Each structure stands twice: as structure tokens, then as C-alpha cells.
Amino acid sequence: GGTHDTKQAIFNGLDLEFGSWTNGLSAGTKNAYDNYYLAYPYLKLIKEGRIGIKELDEKVSNILRLIFRTSMSTLKTFGSLGSPEHGQVGRKIAEEGIVLLQNKNNVLPINLDKAEKIVVIGENAIKMMTVGGGSSSLKAKYEITPLVGLEKRIGLQAEVVYARGYVGEPIGEYNGVKTGQNLNDDRTEDELLAEALTVAKDADYVIFFGGLNKNEHQDCEDRDRKQFDLPYNQNKVITELAKVNKNLIVVNISGNAVDMPWVNDVPAIVQGWYLGSEAGSALASVLVGDVSPSGKLPFTFPAKLEHVGAHALGEYPGNKEDLAHSKNWGDTINTTYHEDIFVGYRWADKEKLTPLFPFGHGLSYTKFAYGKLSVDKRSMTVDETITFTICIKNTGTCEGQEVVQLYISDKKSSLPRPVKELKGFKKVRLAPGEEKEVTLTIDKEALSFFDDVRHEWVVEPGDFEAIIAASATDIKKKVKFALK
């Protein structure tokens, strides 16, 4: 876990120590209380008179205060968990998080006025992902799958045909929680592919829902992925579908990057994430154009696995040390991240690598124009702020949202620094033809970095550059300023 010292935890603001066990590695232990830093070791210090109970009282007060403000609040009415209003909020959040990675020839949004047959292919179109167990699995009252979401939205406007395409993990169970789904299918890969190609040939649109899932060595706890490629023969299915239908849309359901060797053959690619209860409804809204996509990637999709720091430096999979107390959890692998602070887009910038899709990337169904960038001062002191202003205009034909990103580049530093770092962003909604001013303000914290020798945050006078961008590689405007 993240706690490693009892006294540090006591005197530096930690109120509640979380964790299933004690070290994040073992599958369970009978003496867990003895090993939590804020459990028996804390009690022992108090009993021995080495510390008082002032901090303990503060921690208990903080926890109780939160409980009374939330679960024990008198304003919290019966039935307020998982209400329709919660569903509406969940759907809106899901819609705004969906990322349009690629859209050649404006295949998206789907034109329901002209489409007669829409084919949906892929196990992830029907597989439940939000079934309990923690993290993004959660425990939800319901989950709308992509296929159901599309069928409900399209209704009688077009025929929706489904084919499995591939079989991944037919079991409907995650972390001991059962979905009730039975996805068993005894057909061979060739039989599944043949069916998919047959129904896809004459379709107006083909939507492939693939990616990863929550099973072992996928997007799960404890076990790393075994491959960067999509599993379960998906790459072959996508490649063959692209040969028979020019309007192929791939929706990747995953929590992290995957290899896309077919990227040049597929016109439209959507990053669909794990979107919760309203996943299917949100994806349908974006695919048919009810909502213009406005999500941005929170990490880099590398062009190849060797473009990731740990792999480029030969550190992964590292030294295989079995640190687990229980063999049920398998071997634990220690990897030393010698790329240091140069992770994600910072590594790509440093090594001058071209990613498949960069950090901060995300397309829209409309277009945005970036105007002149202005700054309220050319130099600042450590006690001042500096504000950048830019005009953004929707030059397209539909409403949309753009995420304006502010990166800062430190031109000279006593320690190695990234080429640039994201220090602010703002999302702006614009009607067709509308324009708005977007302002982003930073202070000295945005110019600071951690000095691991002095063991403190420092800010050094010098020259900086503010970069306004639509992604880590889509630079729009720059302006220089100084810290005195």
C-alpha cells in the first residue's frame, strides 16, 4: 500500500488507512490488524506513552464528520441511492468521457436518415462490465450494454443485426460477483468470423465492439496483461471486416492502450472505456450524433510497446521475485522505472517519438479555430499569478465542446525537466459559429518541481514558455514569459 510508516501517517494528515490486506500483495492474513500501520502499531505507541491521543481524536472527528455529512445526513431520503437522477448524471459523464480517436471521411456520426442496416459485432457489445468487486467494476443496480443501448436509440429507424465475432471470457463472474450472464459459445474462430463477414458485407455501417475485459491478465487487479495486442483473435476479425465494409467503426472498450495494427484500414475508432450503468446509452448517443464527442485521452497510445519507457530501457518485466505470501496471487514482478519523471507524453517528447494517439487527443464532429493568445504580463514574481487568454471559435455545423490545454515549458533548470507539462485545461461548449474567450491562470506552483536532493518543492527564476494545445502534439499557440 501507500503507507509505510506509523508515525509519518499519524502526524502528517492520514485519517484512514485503506487496503484489503496489509502490503497490497498477500491474499489474506489472520493477523492483518497487527500489520496495518494505523492499527496495532498505533495502539502500541499510545499504550507505551510514546504519543498522545490528540491526533487520534482529530482523525476520528474527521471521519465522523464525513459520515454525518453523507450517509447519516437527515437530508438523505430513502431511495436516493442509484436514483434516476444518478443515472442521468452517469450518462452525461459517460458521454463527455468518450474519445473519438479517428474519423476518416466523416464516417461518424451514423446517418440514421440513410442507414437501413447496422451490424453490431463483438463480445464487448453484450458483455456486462460493471458487476461489482471494486475499482471500475463497482456494484450497480443495472447496466445497459452497447447493443441494448443502440437498439433502444435506433428503434425502428434501421435494422440492427448482431454477430458475436469472437469469444473471449464467457464466464459471468468478477471477483466472486456473478453477472448472471452465460456467454458460452462452442463455435470455432473461423465459424464466428464467417458469420460476422456474411452479415457485414451489405451493411450500411458495421460497429465492432472489442477491446479488453475484467478477466485475468486483462483490465484486472494483480496480473499484468500478457500482450499489447487485442486478445481473442480480434485483430484478425477487424482486419477482415475492413476488407468487406468501408464504413467500419471500431469501439475499443478498455481502461488502457492497445495495439492497433489495422489503424490505417479502419476509418472510425472510438475509445469507449468502462462507462458504468449507462454505458450503452452514452455510446449510442455519441455514435448517432445526439452528442458530439468531447473526451480527451488521459494517457498516450504508443505506436509500439518499445515506445514505452520501461520497455525501451529493458526494465520490463523486471526481476521476477515472488513477494506474495500466497501463491494464489501468482508471481510478483518488480520493475524499476528508470525513466524517472519522463512517463507518458513526457517520455514521447524527450525521445521525439510519434505516438499512435497522443495524450490529450480527442476529435469532435465539429471544428474549432484558435485565435490570438494573449498574456496579462510578460514577467511574474513568486507571489503573483499570470493569466493566458485565447479565443476559441466553433467553425463547424454542430454544437461541440473543446478542451483547451495549457502546457508549460521550463527553458532552463538545475535538474532534468520534461519538454513540457500540462498545467491547466478548460472545457468550453460552443454553438456553431459561436466564439468565447478562454482564460487559464497559473501561479508559482505550476512552475515548481520537486528537488529529490533537497527533498522539497522548488521554483527557480528564469524563462518559461506557455503552450496552448488541443493535445500534447497538436500545438496551437505559444508565448514566452519570465519568473523574476
Task: Go through the PLM ranges and name each one.
Residues 10-24, 185-188, 268-280:
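Acidic, His- and aromatic-enriched active-site or binding-groove loops in soluble protein domains
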Residues 80-83, 163-245, 250-265:
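Hydrophobic helix-and-loop "lid/oligomerization" segment in the mid-to-C-terminal part
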Residues 397-414, 420-422:
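Short acidic, flexible loop segments centered on an aromatic residue
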Residues 15, 116, 204-206, 267:
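Conserved acidic residues
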Residues 414-452:
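Intrinsically disordered, low-complexity Pro/Gly/Ser/Thr-rich segments with frequent PxxP/GP/PP motifs
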Residues 441-470:
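Short, surface-exposed ligand- or partner-binding patches at beta-edge/loop junctions that are enriched
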Residues 1-33, 44-55:
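Second-shell residues forming the walls of enzyme active-site clefts
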Residues 34-36, 43-134, 138-147, 151-156, ...:
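Secreted, periplasmic, or luminal enzymes acting at the cell surface/secretory milieu
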